[in-house]
Amino acid sequence: MTREQQAYDESQIQVLEGLEAVRKRPGMYIGSTSSRGLHHLVWEIVDNSIDEAMAGFCDEIGVVIEEDNSITVTDNGRGIPVGIHEKMGRPAVEVIMTVLHAGGKFGGGGYKVSGGLHGVGASVVNALSTMLEVEVHREGKVHYQKFHRGVPAADLEVIGTTDRTGTKIHFKPDGDIFTETTVFEYDTLASRLRELAFLNKGLRIKITDMREEEKSDEFHYEGGIASFVEHLNRTRETLHETPIHIEGEKQGVYVEIAVQYNDGFTSNIYSFANNINTHEGGTHESGFKTGLTRVINDYARKHNLFKESDPNLTGEDVREGLTAIISVKIPDPQFEGQTKTKLGNSEARTITDSLFTEHFSRFLIEHPQVARKLVDKGLMASRAREAAKKARELTRRKSALEVSSLPGKLADCSSRDASISEIYIVEGDSAGGSAKQGRDRHFQAILPLRGKILNVEKARLDKILANNEIRAIITALGTGIGDDFDIEKARYHKIIIMTDADVDGAHIRTLILTFFYRYMRPLIEHGYVYIAQPPLYKVQQGKDIQYAYGDAELQEILSQLPDKAKPGIQRYKGLGEMNPSQLWETTMDPGQRTVLQVTLEDAMKADEIFEILMGDRVEPRRDFIQENARYVKNLDI
């Protein structure tokens, strides 16, 4: 972005409304009061520093998790204005900290481009913190003010002199609001800060954790999003050595795109608008996809790489094996939905499309060998898609009520209400038999799988759909897969993976999760996927039987037995060792069981781990195992 020395003082701070109701209804402002909402507080403060960086006035940001789980964020920007605000009659910094929708991002004067959740920013963090301190280095003086739950403890005061500029904010979230947790996750903060460093090339961001064992990371990438794509592809075999990097500006919209193809079968496209991850895509992403498909088809036609009778490659074909980052900086972003995850600006589509088309066309002409590889990969994907289409027809159910087309080994439930229905995907026929006998037939369906399903990370869709176990899963769930997926057609709102508590069981569970993540991801995003927790131990003392789900629970049960007791302890290796009534009581009875919901906090991290664990390359997997071996408690060997 170009640096323009604009006035950034108290006159640039606009006030829209007062700070009432934030403490009463925090979810309206930060999404939730769970761990996600807690971390959102940090992003609100960091986003203000990022706005300074995007305007060209800040190149260093620091985030510290203090010993008491409070947070300190520092930057070397211009410092929040401290002059008296004309309308409010209070220092501008106090207005920003205490008035909702007050800030330099509303009138277009202080910042041309900014992020932040609808600009609610610092005042919401202040309202939801037991304590917040702000220290501003500006015009040679250090200004300081402290707040409690959004209310100033004293007036802004000058506490010293300084030869630098910048802002330091220290806050402690309020445990009365964040009742679930007030403990910050280092990895959650670090992965987003790394993302922000990639998206703002040259910016240096440091995170430090002062709790138990001090650790820190520093993120600084001169390559920007091209470095980001290299980072995402580092465990994969790439088709061309360096990412294709494109940047340009039209009508005040700045577009930066980096793409690199690998030999995998899935695409990973991440889009951002003003540094905000647009999970649901939007106009910038669709503009990129349109341009990509058109350019590759035009190139292939012009260079006679297709037969004349061949149809054009589809978007799905040309995106196979693609890793791409699209980042736009736009003056007046229109985000659809309160969570800001879909960009709606129509100009972003045309500008992204035209800039990408122009640069990517030139790249293909200048690199004919790479162009040929991309077209060949698309053609192979097209053939696989046609084969998959035929295979898919075999798996498609004729209607949600027509049971005849369901897989033969599925023991369906009698309920047709998907919201109360659940399906257990069970490892092995013997456990499947026990589960069928032990279940509640009204709302519980059982689908036994024979052996291990295909590793979808290493296979194309046509091969995946030829696998009987996967076809049984697709047909039973009823949603379709990939681009045809429709969450409304889900026949069950709880899909519970139930495997043995050993290495093989864990492997089968990972294979099923890999399939869901790659081809039925909305099931995970909507919270439909669960993992059953069968007991590890059965403790029998006379006629009294208790079950333990882990070593700590086993020790607790044993400690409560009489001193001279000699209980029988059985460690379950497989589900088949339990009879139907035991399986129901321990693992399937909704009133007694424990099931773990599978959630998706960080799609990029999940993508990377699936690729490391399930992909072709051995080296990244070995490194991962060596790094994480110290966390293993029970080895099943």
UniProtKB/Swiss-Prot annotation:
SMART domains xref list: HATPase_c, TOP2c
Gene Ontology CC: chromosome; cytoplasm
Catalytic activity: ATP-dependent breakage, passage and rejoining of double-stranded DNA
Site (Interaction with DNA): K452, N455
Cofactor note: Binds two Mg(2+) per subunit. The magnesium ions form salt bridges with both the protein and the DNA. Can also accept other divalent metal cations, such as Mn(2+) or Ca(2+).
Keywords (A to Z) from UniProt: ATP-binding, Cytoplasm, DNA-binding, Isomerase, Magnesium, Metal-binding, Nucleotide-binding, Topoisomerase
Listed Gene3D superfamilies: 3.30.230.10, 3.40.50.670, Histidine kinase-like ATPase, C-terminal domain
GO molecular function: ATP binding; DNA binding; DNA negative supercoiling activity; metal ion binding
EC class of the enzyme, as a word: isomerase
Residue sites binding Mg(2+) 1 per the record: E427, D500
InterPro entries from the UniProt entry: DNA_gyrase_B_C, GyrB, HATPase_C_sf, Ribosomal_Su5_D2-typ_SF, Ribsml_uS5_D2-typ_fold_subgr, Topo_IIA, Topo_IIA-like_dom_sf, Topo_IIA_B
Binding site for Mg(2+) 2: D500, D502
Toprim domain span: 421-535
GO biological process, one term: DNA topological change
Cellular compartments annotated: Cytoplasm
EC numbers on record: 5.6.2.2
Pfam family of the protein (one): DNA_gyraseB
PROSITE patterns xref list: TOPOISOMERASE_II, TOPRIM
Complex formation: Heterotetramer, composed of two GyrA and two GyrB chains. In the heterotetramer, GyrA contains the active site tyrosine that forms a transient covalent intermediate with DNA, while GyrB binds cofactors and catalyzes ATP hydrolysis.
Function: A type II topoisomerase that negatively supercoils closed circular double-stranded (ds) DNA in an ATP-dependent manner to modulate DNA topology and maintain chromosomes in an underwound state. Negative supercoiling favors strand separation, and DNA replication, transcription, recombination and repair, all of which involve strand separation. Also able to catalyze the interconversion of other topological isomers of dsDNA rings, including catenanes and knotted rings. Type II topoisomerases break and join 2 DNA strands simultaneously in an ATP-dependent manner.
Family in the record: Belongs to the type II topoisomerase GyrB family.
Note from the entry: Few gyrases are as efficient as E.coli at forming negative supercoils. Not all organisms have 2 type II topoisomerases; in organisms with a single type II topoisomerase this enzyme also has to decatenate newly replicated chromosomes.
Protein name: DNA gyrase subunit B
Organism of provenance: Halalkalibacterium halodurans (strain ATCC BAA-125 / DSM 18197 / FERM 7344 / JCM 9153 / C-125)
